[in-house]
Amino acid sequence: MISKEEILSIYEGYNKEEITIVTVGSHTSLHILKGAKLEGFSTAVITTKDRATPYKRFGVADKYIYVDNFSDISNEEIQKQLIEMNAIIIPHGSFIAYCGLDNLENNFKVPMFGNRQILRWEAERDLEGKLLKESGLRIPKKLNSPDEINCPVMVKFPGARGGRGYFPCSTTEEFWKKVEIFKERGILTDEDVGNAHIEEYVVGTNYCIHYFYSPLKNQVELMGIDSRYESNIDGIVRVPAKDQMELDINPSYVISGNFPVVIRESLLPQVFDMGDKLVAKAEEMVAPGMIGPFCLQSLCNDSLELVVFEMSARIDGGTNSFMNGSAYSCLYSGEPLSMGQRIAKEIKLALELDMMDKILY
């Protein structure tokens, strides 16, 4: 693991007057880059030429770093170019997937906003479950083997895959039947199946809660809440029940979009309590803990209990649903505030206070 001291020593060689905010052109890069520009930073996007159009049309990037493949982002030549432009990387789900956790931990030496150590804790289900459970959050019951399935469960797989390959089932036989279907489609591999995470199926409404923890202010902020459009399950529910049976469609849960939601105000104390507990425990277990944006993906059951089924330890894709601010983020200052701009504000404040060591790794 690259040490924080090594990253900070690289940052010390930067021209602090010419910091460039950089991310990979995907996931949440539009409002990351736009937010940085609104706070006066220079911006750059790492992209392939065939995917540069949105960033040019929206005008969010000052510079373009072209790669043949996104996996090239950890190449020494690209890293050297980033360091020369005084880059601070904002990691998101696609960046982590393309770079790879091992590379990120051991080879990628460009200063990043947040805590790179905690990214493995969101990717590996056992570590994620341990952190959520020890934080005192309600999580779905985990089954250790397909042989234990005797009730409705949800089957998930490691990494940031946007729900691809997830499926529900109720018996061991149904588990293996669906596994074979997804393997035939090229969606799952034997390695995926060996790492399957099987958990209790919680019936409830979906709330993906987006927080920001400021180590400079020692404050957990609620930035917004979204829910997801998932294919093909959201299409299936529009088909009459009798036709669903005849069509015999296997549901999938691939996230194809997000929409903003608000939660009952009486549930907000529970929402803040969950964020506070996770931040406190993360600092204890994976120092320096949650830095900046994170997300708790939850289901609210009919007892109005929020059950957390997943976490993101970095900016989550659902923040795209409030690029011009959310019903919650605007309450802090009365101005529209995206998660991307909130990140940029934290970096700007850290520069002013000479406290970049609190937010970089």
Swiss-Prot record:
Taxonomic source organism: Methanococcus aeolicus (strain ATCC BAA-1280 / DSM 17508 / OCM 812 / Nankai-3)
Top EC class of this enzyme: ligase
Keywords: ATP-binding, Ligase, Magnesium, Manganese, Metal-binding, Nucleotide-binding, Purine biosynthesis
Needed co-factor(s): Mg(2+); Mn(2+)
GO biological process: 'de novo' IMP biosynthetic process
Domain of life: Archaea
Catalytic activity line of the entry: 5-amino-1-(5-phospho-beta-D-ribosyl)imidazole-4-carboxamide + formate + ATP = 5-formamido-1-(5-phospho-D-ribosyl)imidazole-4-carboxamide + ADP + phosphate
InterPro entries referenced in this protein's UniProt entry, alphabetically: ATP-grasp, ATP_grasp_subdomain_1, IMP_biosynth_PurP, IMP_biosynth_PurP_C, IMP_biosynth_PurP_N, PreATP-grasp_dom_sf
Any GO MF annotation of the entry: ATP binding
Role summary: Catalyzes the ATP- and formate-dependent formylation of 5-aminoimidazole-4-carboxamide-1-beta-d-ribofuranosyl 5'-monophosphate (AICAR) to 5-formaminoimidazole-4-carboxamide-1-beta-d-ribofuranosyl 5'-monophosphate (FAICAR) in the absence of folates.
Domain ATP-grasp: from-to ranges: 116-348
Binding site for ATP: 146-208, 230
Positions bound to Mg(2+): Q297, E310
Binding site for 5-amino-1-(5-phospho-beta-D-ribosyl)imidazole-4-carboxamide: H27, S94, N258
The gene coding this protein: purP
Name the record gives this protein: 5-formaminoimidazole-4-carboxamide-1-(beta)-D-ribofuranosyl 5'-monophosphate synthetase
Stored PROSITE patterns: ATP_GRASP
PANTHER family per UniProt: 5-FORMAMINOIMIDAZOLE-4-CARBOXAMIDE-1-(BETA)-D-RIBOFURANOSYL 5'-MONOPHOSPHATE SYNTHETASE, 5-FORMAMINOIMIDAZOLE-4-CARBOXAMIDE-1-(BETA)-D-RIBOFURANOSYL 5'-MONOPHOSPHATE SYNTHETASE-RELATED
Cofactor info, note text: Binds 1 Mg(2+) or Mn(2+) ion per subunit.
